[in-house]
Amino acid sequence: MRKLVVGSRRSKLALTQSQQFIDKLKAVEPNLEIEIKEIVTKGDRIVDKQLSKVGGKGLFVKEIQHELFEKNIDMAIHSLKDVPSVIPEGLTLGCIPDRELPFDAYISKTHTPLSQLPEGSIIGTSSLRRGAQILSKYPNLEIKWIRGNIDTRLEKLQTEDYDAIILAAAGLRRMGWSDDIVTSYLDRDTLLPAIGQGALGIECRSDDEELLTLLSKVHNDEVAKCVTAERTFLAEMDGSCQVPIAGYATISDQKEIEFTGLIMTPDGKERFEYTMNGTDPVELGKKVSNKLKEQGAYEIIKRLNEQH
């Protein structure tokens, strides 16, 4: 096997999860020589604005995909939730490895449970999806935007006027933070995850047969089916970063995929949700999308997209 070059964002989390995946590859192919090339993306350069206001999807992957096309790197290790639902022609997701915990972590400054926060308490989040779902269940709380890496957000929780923050559990776990700092992990009924949350997507060139064969050794087919249902739903709903959209699939003991899709307004006042079971992930994602469109969810999406 030739020497491989992996493209990664420069953030601590991106580099850590890249190294963790490389270790997984080396466990099945010990003699691999792999180098990490750090790439700064547009999303990394914009630190003072809400991402949904500056183009959302693709902000963390376009520069990396360019490096793949130029053959400066052989593969890219993405957080799957950052990857747009349509992959450019000539590239492919060559592998979906094991999924980390897909839920969100709620961290309170005073360890107060979410359901017991006093009226007017301020919750920091970087996501419309989280904000909308929290306001839907707890309209007496206030959402305030927070940006930055995990360390920055934890510091802001202590030094600024946030009473709590919500962030992806997967990032905390991959960075080695212990469960002790988490007040609670929010289950799917409290906060449905983002599309692909907790999963990695390993992107490479579609014609790189040698690499695709290697990647197949660490591919998790069940996780791939789940995220395919989720990402199909995202593509069908034409979900952009202006739209609070969530979707989560699991596989039952009967080997059926159960998928829940959710569309909301940012203020949490309008909510469209549907759950369905099936065996074909693409068909399932499309069916749930069609159900939500029948309920009127697509009108919300069009309205929100037009506003931006």
Curated annotation (Swiss-Prot):
Keywords tagged on the record: Porphyrin biosynthesis, Transferase
Family annotation (SUPFAM superfamilies): Periplasmic binding protein-like II, Porphobilinogen deaminase (hydroxymethylbilane synthase), C-terminal domain
S-(dipyrrolylmethanemethyl)cysteine, modified sites: C241
Cofactor note: Binds 1 dipyrromethane group covalently.
Example GO BP: protoporphyrinogen IX biosynthetic process
Protein biosynthesis keyword on record: no
Function: Tetrapolymerization of the monopyrrole PBG into the hydroxymethylbilane pre-uroporphyrinogen in several discrete steps.
PANTHER family associated with the record: PORPHOBILINOGEN DEAMINASE
Recorded family membership: Belongs to the HMBS family.
Subunit and partners: Monomer.
Name recorded for this polypeptide: Porphobilinogen deaminase
Protein species of origin: Staphylococcus aureus (strain MRSA252)
